[in-house]
């Protein structure tokens, strides 16, 4: 729902459908957003473009596990990694003016850059000019440091423009309020969250405690 949240805040967009294979994530999405009348697709591989209305924008955060440094990095050899091609298939059929894609930063360097080169070639073949940039959520008011690559595709001959003219906006970090062991640390909630030590013991060792104003 990250794309949906941002576009709702921006205004001027109407969501006509969404795709989510995880039943719990789907339930959360439907709790957060009014999806009445929207088309729902469980599996991107089974989407028939003829079931979609004309659309101006496709947003897709295709699965990152296949490209993340935290995983096995099997790339397109992992079924999850091939879901990008489903996005391209639908885009080729529906020809939206814009594509907005997101994934982990390591997508750029995975397989010595060959994976990202394939993505660029596919988007070029279906008629999209592409730009991309790595952005950190910490610079946009989110209390965590999370780098992601954002890719925009502009339908050639129909849409063109520039994007990603961003600057640092939220350099604050969390203040440690109470000293002590990893499991006993308490932080203020007005800055960036620290990365917890997964092997720390004790109460809240893996999550941390935050002072939240009420």
For each predicted feature, which ranges?
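SAM cofactor-binding core of SAM-dependent methyltransferases
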Residues: 1-45
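Class I S-adenosyl-L-methionine
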Residues: 47-57, 65-214
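Short, hydrophobic/glycine-enriched beta-strand segments
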Residues: 2, 57-59
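Generic enzyme active-site microenvironment
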Residues: 18, 41, 59, 100-101
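Glycine-rich, N-terminal phosphate-binding loop of Rossmann-like dinucleotide-binding domains
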Residues: 62
């Amino acid at each position: 729902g990250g794309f949906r949240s941002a576009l709702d805040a921006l205004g001027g967009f109407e969501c006509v459908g969404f795709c989510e294979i995880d039943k719990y994530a789907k339930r959360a999405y439907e709790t957060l957003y009014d999806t009445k009348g929207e088309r729902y697709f469980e599996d991107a591989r089974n989407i028939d473009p003829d079931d979609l209305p004309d659309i101006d924008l496709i947003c897709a955060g295709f699965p990152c596990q296949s490209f993340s440094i935290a995983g096995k990095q099997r790339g397109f050899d992992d079924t999850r990694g091939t879901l990008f091609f489903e996005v391209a298939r639908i885009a080729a059929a529906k020809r939206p003016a814009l594509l907005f894609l997101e994934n982990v930063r390591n997508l750029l360097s995975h397989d010595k850059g060959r994976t990202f080169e394939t993505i660029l070639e596919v988007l070029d073949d279906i008629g999209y000019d592409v730009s991309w940039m790595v952005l950190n959520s910490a610079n946009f008011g989110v209390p965590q440091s999370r780098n992601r690559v954002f890719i925009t595709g502009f339908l050639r001959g129909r849409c063109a423009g520039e994007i990603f003219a961003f600057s640092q906006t939220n350099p604050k970090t969390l203040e440690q309020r109470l000293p002590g062991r990893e499991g006993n640390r308490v932080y203020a909630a007005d800055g960036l969250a620290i990365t917890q030590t997964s092997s720390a013991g004790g109460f809240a060792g893996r999550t941390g405690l935050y002072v939240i104003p009420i």
